[in-house]
């Protein structure tokens, strides 16, 4: 997290760093954390999704990709819950005016859960229950901006194979293509400040663009 020690005079604001699976979000977050002490960086709670396991030792993340219609609602609830817990903790302990989060509850709601419902992998009842939960507890976080790493689904697929994260080996290309379209639709409709990064940008170039983007919120 950020290197400063004194708490800001007001509640920090949140900037969501988004992109397809395998876009390079985790790598960029790690580099940003080291290079930008004026920012706090909160990485995605993937560890929680991997440690939640059934009797056979299969993680919730693996189960979701193995049988998406069966586990979509369960996983999306888990994703928004674990992210909400981590984000609220970061806000309470925040020592910088801006917190960069690897994805956000908005991503959970407007990209992943919305896509699951539209594709029929969450029922109408499950969707309505999800929205009640989300609207009651998650929608009022101080998210002020979105950053998107624009990466082709094909490149994302290659990077997923390279990193070899357990549970992701079965992700099909059409799923990544659908996620890309869902992200594009969300960014087109949002009223929040946005920044798009190219997959061709170096890590240093991306960090500089993010630091400049975040200055408007200080």
Question: For each predicted feature, which ranges?
Answer:
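A glycine- and Lys/Arg-enriched "phosphate-lid" helix/loop adjacent to the NTP-binding pocket
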Residues: 109-181
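Hydrophobic anchor at the beta1->P-loop junction of P-loop NTPases
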Residues: 17
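Conserved lysine of the Walker
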Residues: 25
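P-loop (Walker A) phosphate-binding loop of NTP-binding proteins
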Residues: 20
